[in-house]
């Protein structure tokens, strides 16, 4: 029961914060003709004798609706047909998506994400303290989230943890883990933004 209440609190925090920031909630189709973005395999199905897929992202619809509302968000399931044997992947999950128009830089997005986390953590402390105690959960400090450039992050991990850089254009799972470890040791933060990710991997 407590886990479901915490899940409720996170989604509630997401909605409440974005409403306060002038966002409009949208509801997009989950059955489509094609995928919205590359890099993910699709669950394919027969839709009344026509090929269709389960959507792996609302990206296309979000970008369309930004032209109407400027700021939009959605809380909904997404589906990714990727075979895996790790704790890092899910074939179905609830995605918290938002899209903004007319921003000055990616730092505007980072500020919005930081604001959401700060708002939601305070909401959980205030309204879900009982559930947090049952689960023996200590919420992370999100008063400030550090940022590090992609190339600098790769270099720091290589120097501090003796890991050879094998792929200069992407982060390997172990590197992601070590960047998180570096952020905790260097800034005492459980979160970190990695900026200036190579555009060829986007």
Predicted features, each with a name:
Residues 66-76, 111, 134, 192, ...:
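Short, mixed-charge, low-aromatic patches
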Residues 28, 36-41, 115-202:
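Metal-assisted phosphate- and nucleotidyl-transfer catalytic regions
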Residues 69, 96, 104-126:
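His/Asp/Glu-rich mid-to-C-terminal helical/loop segments that flank catalytic regions of hydrolases
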Residues 15, 110-113, 154:
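A generic alpha-helix structural signal
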